[in-house]
Amino acid sequence: MIVAVPNSGASRINQSGVEALREFPNFPIGGILFKDIAPMLAGRGALGEVVSTVASQVSGTEIDAILAVDARGFILGASLADRLGCGFIMVRKPGKLPGDVLSFEYSCEYCSGTLEVTAGLIGDGLRCLIADDLLATGGTARATGNFVKSQGGEIAGYAFILEIEVLKGRRQLDDAPVISAMTC
């Protein structure tokens, strides 16, 4: 169960949620402590609670589309788009989208690479909420936000299932609202 913290704009993991997260040292590379959300999401109703927590925080915000980052961002992004009744745009790894695509570079705490979006989906004034599973250093989310702005879109905010506060990733994300269903 996820317990909301009043007036924080985020939620905290209660004791059972903390126990459900698994940690894998040195994955995917040395020096990284990987936080695995899969066991937490396997709990009955957990995904619904995450989506409800984020949806309540963006209530009243104008959002045209959720941009969800490949692949675990799709977990939150698709469910949230359905709940909010807005569009859903996939931000994919190279070679996963057919047709014309636009690409941009990103870097995070353990890698760098390229992401792609189907050409023509983001246009002038499209209000986008960027969704991913985890906010660590903010590199992927920042690059995605910069891409949206380069296409004439606007950032309505950023949404994450889990935020690792000690890495201070939210400092990288403009002045747009940052919503994390859980923090650790």
Curated annotation (Swiss-Prot):
CDD domains assigned: PRTases_typeI
Gene3D superfamilies xref list = 3.40.50.2020
Which pathway is this protein engaged in? Answer: Purine metabolism; AMP biosynthesis via salvage pathway; AMP from adenine: step 1/1
Give GO terms: molecular function aspect only: adenine binding; adenine phosphoribosyltransferase activity; AMP binding
Q: What InterPro entries does the entry give? A: Ade_phspho_trans, PRibTrfase_dom, PRTase-like, UPRTase/APRTase
BP GO terms, sorted:
adenine salvage; AMP salvage; purine ribonucleoside salvage
Enzymatic reactions: AMP + diphosphate = 5-phospho-alpha-D-ribose 1-diphosphate + adenine
EC number(s) on file: 2.4.2.7
Tell me where in or outside the cell this protein is found. Answer: Cytoplasm
Does the keyword Glycosyltransferase feature in the UniProt annotation? Answer: yes
GO CC: one term? Answer: cytoplasm
Q: What is its main location?
A: cytoplasm
Per the record, the domain of life is Bacteria
Protein's UniProt keywords contain Glycosyltransferase: yes
Keywords (alphabetical) are:
Cytoplasm, Glycosyltransferase, Plasmid, Purine salvage, Transferase
- Outline what the protein does: Catalyzes a salvage reaction resulting in the formation of AMP, that is energically less costly than de novo synthesis.
Q: Which family does it belong to?
A: Belongs to the purine/pyrimidine phosphoribosyltransferase family.
Concerning NCBIfam families, the annotation shows: PRK02304.1-5
How this chain assembles, per its entry, is:
Homodimer.
User: What is the designated name of this protein?
Assistant: Adenine phosphoribosyltransferase 2
